[in-house]
Structure formats: C-alpha cells, structure tokens
C-alpha cells in the first residue's frame, strides 16, 4: 500500500465503536502504516487489534496498549473518541463533567508525552468543551487542535438532498456553526441545490423548521433507530480531518476551532466556524448569513460560554484570565 505519511497516528478510545471504525477508515484511506490503538479497556482494544490484524492490510504496523506513555510517545497525529457515549434520553451537555475530566487528562498526556504532535482531533461530547479543555491542558497552539462539527452539516445536507431528490453532493453550503449541540446555528442563506439557491426552491418556512429540527436532533434519531449513538459518520469525518492535517485532501466542512476574536465578539471558546484544515492546521473565516442566522449563532456562542464557565467552576480548567499560565499559546 501507498501511505500519505509514515508518522505515528494514535487512536484514543480505539476499543469502542467510533475508535475501531476510525482505525479501519484510516487504514483503508492509506493515511499511515503506523497506528497505535489506545484504550483503558483491555479486552476491547485487544479485540479491535485482532480484528484489524485479521483484515490483513499489507505493510502496516498496528500496535495496541493501555499505557498512555507508550501510546502518546512519538505521536504526530491523534484522534480521540475516548469519552463516554451518549445514550437515549441524554443530551451532549449531560456528558459535560465526566468527559471534560477525561479531556483534561488527555491534554495533560499530550503535554507530557508528545508535545511535538502536529494535530489533534477531539470528537467525544460535548465536543466543543472537551476540545477546549484538552487544548488548555495540552499547551498546543490553537491551530493544532480541532473538534468534530462537520457531522451536523452533513446531516443538514442529507436532509435537503432527500427533500429535493438529488444526490447529496449536489447540495452545497449546508452548514451549521457555533456549538455541536442542541443550540447549534443552522444556516440556509448560502445553500444551493444542484446550483440553485435554496430560497428559489419553494421550501416553506414550516418545512424548513422541520428540517432544522431534524438536523439538530440527528444524533438522537440515530440512537432511537439503532439503539446506540452514531459511530460510522463521526469516525469517517474525524479521519478525513486528520487526513487533511497530514497534507492530504483539504477538509472544508465546518470544524470546531478555538476562537478569540475581538471583531467577531467571540472570546475564548471552541466553536464551529467556516474552516479549512490543511497541513498548516485549522484556519477560520468570518461567518456570513442573514441577521436571523447571525443572531442564532450569537445565542449558540452564549451557550458555549455558559458551559465553559461551568467547567471553570468545577475546577477542570482555570479561570480564563489564568489560561496563559497553563497554555502560553492561548
């Protein structure tokens, strides 16, 4: 097989459904032959290792461990799904305290064992806040760490494609910004369906509101249908994000990134923005939309600030004014 790089990729939470799918996707896409599977659950990660070995990918060097030092040392790229999954009846925010403690330890391990890592993708919920926690604790630069947000946009894209009976890739500009949660801002003004603006497609306001609701509840719908949280779609999107950071195809769907921007009025949060991920990291631009869309984005930002302040109160991260002491790059 030909590989994009030989650098070490670590999959955290590799014993779970998302983690194991990420391992397989990374190998099928030919990202790197050197992949370390890390999890605290020995039977699970051992089982994934055996299955991946039994796929018989040629030329690969797949290892597994439950030791963080062994896993992280020498890592250049990391994807972490190493948090508790959402269950039926739960919101992403319900996972806040426990998963942010996991994210803090994750960030500490990066700082301790692989400070030279190139890029990190965090996908366990609530992803905006777990990623922010990991960034603060890791000491990394903001452009080196991203969180999963694209899944909300692909859910919106899917819903519109089904609505109008077109191939999904014929729907463009279907993006959500702000938080990866029930307060996400769903933007319609730049959507085109087979090249035609959504505003010209005859979609009623009532139907648009239904599609928005379906998008926001996309993760809950999967849980109801399958009896477990999504794993194929977050795994694939996360692997495509790290592929871009390795120098592969640029990732242009929205990603969660650190924003501290006076002009935009968004300060000290991780949030989904119009972004590009490439070999140099993640870069965001100013969102454009209607007055109503931008107001919903402001509301989403305020919700993210509230969750950020909660983890400060819990002592998981220090007060904002002290972040630079923990991470001079912020």
Model segments located where?
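Conserved N-terminal Rossmann-fold NAD(P) cofactor-binding segment
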Residues: 6, 31-75, 309-312, 316
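Conserved hydrophobic helix-helix packing surfaces used for dimerization/oligomerization
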Residues: 8-9, 120
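Conserved glycine-rich cofactor-binding loop
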Residues: 15
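N-terminal Rossmann-fold NAD(P) dinucleotide-binding loop
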Residues: 19-20
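Conserved S-adenosyl-L-methionine
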Residues: 28-34, 139-142
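Rossmann-like NAD(P)-binding element
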Residues: 55-119
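Rossmann-like NAD(P)(H) cofactor-binding subdomain of soluble oxidoreductases
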Residues: 91-159
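C-terminal substrate-binding/catalytic lobe of Rossmann-fold NAD(P)-dependent dehydrogenases
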Residues: 138-144, 153-330
């Amino acid at each position: 097989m030909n590989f994009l790089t030989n650098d070490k990729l670590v999959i955290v939470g590799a014993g779970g459904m998302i983690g194991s799918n990420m391992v397989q996707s990374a190998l099928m896409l030919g990202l790197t032959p050197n992949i370390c599977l890390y999890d605290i659950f020995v039977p699970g990660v051992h089982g994934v290792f055996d299955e991946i070995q039994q796929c018989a990918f040629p030329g690969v060097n797949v290892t597994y461990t439950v030791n963080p030092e062994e896993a992280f040392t020498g890592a250049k790229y990391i994807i972490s799904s190493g948090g508790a999954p959402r269950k039926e009846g739960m919101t992403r925010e319900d996972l806040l305290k426990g998963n942010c403690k996991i994210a803090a330890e994750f960030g500490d391990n990066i700082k301790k064992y692989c400070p030279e890592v190139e890029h990190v993708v965090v996908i366990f919920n609530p992803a905006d806040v777990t990623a922010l926690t990991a960034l603060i604790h890791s000491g990394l630069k903001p452009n080196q760490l991203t969180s999963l947000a694209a899944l909300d946009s692909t859910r919106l894209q899917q819903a519109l494609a089904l609505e109008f009976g077109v191939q999904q890739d014929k729907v463009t500009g279907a993006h959500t910004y702000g938080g990866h949660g029930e307060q996400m801002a769903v933007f319609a003004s730049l959507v085109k369906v087979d090249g035609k603006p959504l505003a010209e497609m005859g979609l009623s306001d009532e139907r648009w509101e239904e599609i928005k609701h379906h998008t926001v509840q996309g993760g809950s719908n999967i849980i109801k249908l399958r009896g477990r949280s999504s794993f194929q779609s977050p795994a694939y999107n996360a692997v495509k994000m790290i592929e871009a950071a390795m120098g592969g195809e640029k990732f242009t769907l929205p990603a969660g990134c650190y924003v501290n921007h006076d002009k935009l009025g968004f300060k000290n949060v991780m949030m989904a923005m119009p972004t590009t991920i490439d070999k140099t990291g993640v870069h965001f631009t100013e969102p454009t939309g209607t007055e109503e869309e931008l107001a919903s984005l402001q509301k989403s930002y305020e919700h993210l600030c509230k969750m950020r302040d909660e983890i400060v109160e819990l002592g998981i991260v220090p007060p904002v004014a002290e972040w630079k002491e923990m991470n001079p790059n912020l």
